[in-house]
């Protein structure tokens, strides 16, 4: 019986640690995405092509990470709200270019099948995030 209590305590501790780490990761993804997104949104017209592509790649990577992370079922409401807020803005700034980037990567024959499967999951997560955060988002008139 005491051994069962030890194992249950370990399981509870591990779940709590995983839950907390997952929430902190959501905040980290949002904060890592914030700076390049603000720079890109404010200076896109003044950037040269190489800078624009570099910032777009960084932002797309952050959007993909956030879209995948928001699918975790035990994500805290506040952490998900912070992530969703920034992801919604990022998806508006980048538009369909994010999905196109990952579709082109998936269509490439140079990528192994395992990575193509991961890319397909990323594209599905991006599509779901776009529907939830852009298409189904309440309009300004509906919020008032």
Q: What annotation goes with each model-predicted range?
A:
Residues 1-3:
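N-terminal signal-anchor/signal peptide hydrophobic helix marking the start
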Residues 5-31:
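Transmembrane signal-anchor/signal-peptide helices with a preference for the extracytoplasmic
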Residues 29, 33, 37-89:
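Extracytoplasmic/periplasmic/luminal assembly and interaction segments
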Residues 73-144:
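Low-complexity intrinsically disordered segments
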């Amino acid at each position: 019986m005491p051994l069962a209590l030890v194992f249950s305590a370990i399981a509870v501790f591990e779940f709590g640690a995983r839950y907390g780490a997952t929430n902190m990761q959501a905040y980290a993804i949002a904060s890592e995405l914030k700076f390049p997104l603000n720079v890109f949104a404010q200076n896109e017209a003044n950037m040269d092509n190489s800078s624009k592509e570099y910032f777009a790649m960084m932002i797309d990577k952050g959007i993909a990470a956030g879209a995948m992370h928001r699918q975790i079922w035990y994500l805290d409401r506040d952490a998900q709200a912070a992530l969703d807020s920034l992801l919604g803005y990022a998806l508006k700034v980048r538009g369909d270019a994010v999905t196109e980037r990952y579709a082109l990567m998936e269509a490439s024959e140079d990528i192994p099948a395992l990575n193509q499967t991961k890319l397909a999951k990323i594209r599905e997560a991006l599509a779901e995030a776009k529907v939830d955060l852009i298409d189904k988002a309440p309009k300004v008139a509906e919020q008032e």
